[in-house]
Amino acid sequence: MNKNNIIGFLLIAVVLIGFSWYNQPSAEEQRTAFVQDSIAKAKHAEMEKASKAAAAKRQTDAKAKVEADSTALFYSALKGQAKKIVLKNEKVELTLNTKGATVEKAVIKGYVGHNLQVKDGSAEAKDVTLFEGNDQSLKFMLEAKEANIITSDLYFTPSNVTDKSVTMTAVAGEGKTLTLTYTLGDDYMLHMSLQANGMAGLFSPNYNKMDVDWSDKARQQERGFMFENRYTTLTYHNAEGGTDHLNEGSEKIDEKIEETIDWVSFKNQFFSAIIVSKDNFEKDAFMTSIPQEKGSGYLKQFQAKMKTAFDPTGKKASEFEFYFGPNDFQILKNTEKESTFGKDLEFQKLVYLGWPVIRWINRFFTLYVFDWLSNVFPMGIVLILITLLLKLITYPMVKKSYMSSAKMRVLKPKLEAATAQYNKPEDQMQKQQAMMAEYAKYGVSPLSGCLPMLIQMPVWVAMFNFVPNAIQLRGEKFLWMSDLSTFDPIFEWNTNIWLIGDHLSLTCILFCVANLLYSWMTMRQQRDQMVGQQAEQMKMMQWMMYLMPLMFFFMFNDYSAGLNFYYFISLFFSAAIMWTLRKTTDDEKLLAILEKRYQENKNNPKKASGLMARMQALQEMQRQQQAEMMRKQAELNEKKNNLGK
């Protein structure tokens, strides 16, 4: 760069700096500009605030417009005085409120209610009140062009009132009405139809469904909160068949049902409220269950939000049916005859009878025997008779099992002599084979003792599922038990103790004592027939068996007195049968019979039974595999020793 270029750049820089300095505002101008900028910012903030206020005003005006439209649409129905209409028959008494045109109280006759919502105990026992007042809410929501119509906000005018029917009408304007008609049958079913008249112009042309919002605060009806709460569920029925329920726990549950359903039930342990839609409820119904605190008098808060068909033209009514009644299997099954929808509603599935195999036992045996006996005897006697009947049915197999154990007991000296040479751990396979061979000589099957237990276990599980759901036991007294459907406390206290709760159940204690006695008898019987190390192992296992009654105590202290009483008498009879068989069995005669059989088999050997032959073949295969493994291990050890040398 030459000298002229440098001078030129310097002059340009001087000009730029001078021009910038010349155009720089003075201090006064800067202050003025700052003030103006502050004013501009304030104006901008004010404009934003005004814009927000205007938007809020527009929303308020829009809301006011909707309210004004709604008032104009149902001016006469939005104001009024609520009246009570009572529908009743010999089974139920339903109180309807003209505000909302819904059932606000349901009383089930013939079942004693405890009214646990009254905490001071001043209320006397009377018929069961399923819900009352704000416990229950049902509203239908219709989306009109300019406003939503919510039935719970409207006052309806009753007409054609009888003991079993009523028509309720809300007037929307000239020639425009919304009518709900209720008809009570002779049982627990209430039919309801909702129909619009002259309102087609209020809705969009394609509008054909409405929202149904049903909620209920399930009352505690029984004494045991934890036990009743376990059987209190929100249950729904698939339109294609089959029921399901929310998996309620200790937290709030929200669930979307991705299938079409035709009814929803808010189910207590022994009573249910059900809503059925003739045209079904559409997919994506939203169900909620919220647990309630113990001592509040309530169990769970249920809510079901659904959609179903609605005809704005009024040519077709939206029809519903309600069931307010007991969870009695036969009553629920026969209720379908009261329905006018012609559906297989399967209400009886609300009574849980167990898994498929267990349900089959309860459905086709326990239910029929229970109903038959309960028509003649008190419920406590029915439980005893059912136990005796089951013991009578299983007695031949129990006796066969005991005789098999007795044969093994009298053969114990011979087994010890035959297996005396197999004392090493690696000789256990040979020892088992020697024992099986000795049993085969005398025609004894060591597996025959398992059959009775395999048969009795499904019966025990069946009763475990049946008794807690048997409403026939509710309120029934027997001996010291005031109610067979709940626990029978011998002691109670106010503080909740972990694992025990706030009481001690007498029938649970009796059940556990009987279980301890029966375990001691069976363990001694099994120990008497064991040989060598098996007997020592049995001594160690018996302590585990003795812990079972203690575990059962913590598990069943909250369970019903009826179930614990059944288990108590079942174990008592089992112990009595075992004691009788032991006293009537002569070991010397039994051994003589076995010796005679041995001589007969020795002179005319018989082929082993299929099961015994398979066991012997399996043991022989295991012996060969063990021998092969030992041979390979010996070869490997020999190679290691040779390498070491």
Language-model segment annotations:
Residues 77-345:
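Soluble non-transmembrane domains of integral membrane proteins
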Residues 49-82:
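Short, Gly/Pro- and small/polar-rich lid/capping loops
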Residues 1-54, 96, 193-197, 206, ...:
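Helix-loop-helix
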